[in-house]
Amino acid sequence: MRIGIFDSGVGGITVLKEALNLLPGEDYIYYADTANVPYGTKDKNEVRQYIFKAVEFLINRGIEALVVACNTATSIAIKDLRETYQFPIVGMEPAVKPAVERSRNKKVLVLATPLTIREEKFRNLVSRVKAEDIVDSLGLPGLVEYAEGFVFDENIIIPYLKDRLSPFNLQEYGTLVLGCTHFLYFRDIFNKIIPDHIDIIDGNKGTVRHLKNLLLQSGFKTGSEGSGEIIFYSSGKKDERRLKKYLDILKEI
């Protein structure tokens, strides 16, 4: 079957990597809305228009299921997408519940885009696990821009992260949530600057497992018809070289 994966940019390639591991026999069309990245600092009505334009593009190329591999896009539009389209749709959300469960009676720090943090969906997510008193959040829009610009130099990234994290006493935290798919490119750098006792958690594997279960529940036979083809679009234009660059980076993480 043909699965669409959509993100504001290249962050969702980290989700594609997990999908290739768990659902290797499917065909994938990846859409990076690089003309409009980043979403996390824009007006949500503007972003909603970008999202539906991207999804229509993928529908016109025959997708049978969709992964919204962007926490910001999920928080803004996942409900509207599911009400509009009849095929299986899976979104991303910060992995707050597993982070709370693994925090060992310490606090949880959620890293995301400013728009994700501002949305009611995020507040509801924290409220559902009754964790308002132990969950803090921090927007890191610069990290999205670094990933999009293929900037992974520790001499640039580490000072940025240390500055942004400086208001927090990290000894108080047990888990760090990467609540934006772009942030996974920097997992190794996070590990170098946070205390050893802190676990880093993301929602990628859980999202792909949910996709597989949803496909089976919907009657799809996963791996039965696809050839493992991957097509990558940057705002409507094929860009296979860009895909390869980021997949190569992920092999090293």
From Swiss-Prot:
Substrate binds at D7, S8, Y39, G40, N71, T72, T181, H182. Its EC number is 5.1.1.3. It comes from the Bacteria. GO terms for molecular function: glutamate racemase activity. It is an enzyme of class 5 (isomerase). It holds the Pfam family Asp_Glu_race. Keywords: Cell shape, Cell wall biogenesis/degradation, Isomerase, Peptidoglycan synthesis. SUPFAM superfamilies: Aspartate/glutamate racemase. Gene3D superfamilies: 3.40.50.1860. The active site is at C70, C180. Pathway: Cell wall biogenesis; peptidoglycan biosynthesis. It catalyses: L-glutamate = D-glutamate. One of its GO terms (biological process) is regulation of cell shape. NCBIfam families: glut_race. Belongs to the aspartate/glutamate racemases family. Provides the (R)-glutamate required for cell wall biosynthesis. This is Glutamate racemase.
